[in-house]
Amino acid sequence: MTYCNKSNQTSYPFILPDLPYEKESFKPHFTLETFDYHHGKHHNTYVQNLNNLLKDKEELQKKDLEEIIEWSSQNSNAAIFNNAAQIWNHTFFWHSIKPQGGGKPSGKILEQINKDFGSFEEFCEQFKQEAVGQFGSGWAWLIYHDNRLQIIKTANAGTPIAHGMKPLLACDVWEHAYYIDYRNKRPDYVDIFIKHMINWKFVEDNLIK
């Protein structure tokens, strides 16, 4: 795995990765029901779908998840790409958050944020605008590209690794990520994500790799 080795699974058949924390530890920001649906049902469905799509494709079965994403992107195989990318994106997202996370970071990541955005407050404002502004399902990302931090959004299963970009942080803005707890209030969810969930150590580890 180029960025988050926890997101990489070596080969077919793929399995649903465990969460890196107890589901209960995110109360009151996420309920158990959200994790049961988001991880246990949505994420798991992508895993099952990908395995079914690969069951008769022996050459693809030899590839790891990133290689499958690359192959399916280059060969315009939407079904395989969507499920493989969503497995990768979700696993990366689970590591992008942690209990009692969020707030203002320190160290190299804060230095880089101040350099590229002017201030942490400006970064927060821009990240929230991108996440809330993504029309329909998708993702908001902090990436390192062209020697600087950038905030981008991708629709549906879109992922930075399909375009040679280095992701540092992912925020899932599909409705299934927040609707149980926040209903249609995506801005509230993104605000909580920034203030109470971001795993800044994970972000910095990805930056310095």
Curated annotation (Swiss-Prot):
Cofactor names: Mn(2+); Fe(3+)
Binding-site positions, Mn(2+): H38, H90, D172, H176
Catalytic activity annotation: 2 superoxide + 2 H(+) = H2O2 + O2
GO molecular function annotations of the record: metal ion binding; superoxide dismutase activity
Enzyme class: oxidoreductase
EC numbers on record: 1.15.1.1
Binding positions (Fe(3+)): H38, H90, D172, H176
PROSITE patterns: SOD_MN
Keyword field: Iron, Manganese, Metal-binding, Oxidoreductase
Co-factor note (free text): Binds 1 Mn(2+) or Fe(3+) ion per subunit.
Function (record text): Destroys superoxide anion radicals which are normally produced within the cells and which are toxic to biological systems. Catalyzes the dismutation of superoxide anion radicals into O2 and H2O2 by successive reduction and oxidation of the transition metal ion at the active site.
Family membership: Belongs to the iron/manganese superoxide dismutase family.
Name used for this protein in its record: Superoxide dismutase [Mn/Fe]
Species of origin: Rickettsia conorii (strain ATCC VR-613 / Malish 7)
